[in-house]
Amino acid sequence: MEIFVGTDIMEVERIKKILEKRPHFLERIFTEKEREFLRKKKNPWPHLAGFFSAKESVSKVLGTGIRGFSWQDIEIIHNEYGKPEVVLKGKAKAIAAEKGIKEIKLSISHTSDYAMSVAIAVGGENS
């Protein structure tokens, strides 16, 4: 058994600046479900930074960074209690399967200035 951990921190202002320079960033990085969630927020910026941070954390759990798969292969959703959950698709899902990872646990926190996330998974033989 092996434990996989990924963490990331993101400045909210940085994500704002990225979107100002690259308007298509939102569609390239985030799935329709993620964008729909963000549209419902009065102040989406901390949540946007949190989602981006979460995708980075999950990519670190997979051990690849965002290489070999699309940003949209990692989707962040929320259950009925508002808890963030990870849905893997495409090549990201295949990489997780190769590592014996069946589920990734995720925590996201943010303030008005920063968002951070931690992703943890158990994999390997007999996981």
UniProtKB/Swiss-Prot annotation:
One of its GO terms (biological process) is fatty acid biosynthetic process. Its EC number is 2.7.8.7. It is an enzyme of class 2 (transferase). Pfam families: ACPS (PF01648). Mg(2+) binds at D8, E56. It is found in: Cytoplasm. Its cofactor is Mg(2+). GO terms for cellular component: cytosol. One of its GO terms (molecular function) is holo-[acyl-carrier-protein] synthase activity. NCBIfam families: acpS (TIGR00516), pantethn_trn (TIGR00556). It catalyses: apo-[ACP] + CoA = holo-[ACP] + adenosine 3',5'-bisphosphate + H(+). The keyword Transcription regulation does not apply. It comes from the Bacteria. InterPro entries: 4-PPantetheinyl_Trfase_dom, 4-PPantetheinyl_Trfase_dom_sf, ACPS, P-Pant_transferase_sf, Ppantetheine-prot_Trfase_dom. Transfers the 4'-phosphopantetheine moiety from coenzyme A to a Ser of acyl-carrier-protein. Keywords: Cytoplasm, Fatty acid biosynthesis, Fatty acid metabolism, Lipid biosynthesis, Lipid metabolism, Magnesium, Metal-binding, Transferase. This is Holo-[acyl-carrier-protein] synthase. Belongs to the P-Pant transferase superfamily. AcpS family.
